[in-house]
Amino acid sequence: MKELLLYIARSLVDHPDQVSVTELEGEETVLELRVAPEDMGKVIGKSGRIAKSIRAVVSAAASKSDKKVIVEIDN
């Protein structure tokens, strides 16, 4: 899931070298996405639409392997 999130985020931003994902395992897997401050709007989108879409795609991919994944976006 981490690789999928990296791929999606890097394709959206102007500074793909500053994209990082930290994976925290537990009952649920938490993926913390960090991007450059100037790219934050591109990852969140208007009214959070892009962020919602990213979460939906990652959750759908995770559900295929019976996992629960939460995507958090940090700056």
Question: Where do the language-model regions lie?
Answer:
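RNA-contacting regions in translation and RNA-metabolism proteins
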Residues: 1-40, 46, 53, 57-75
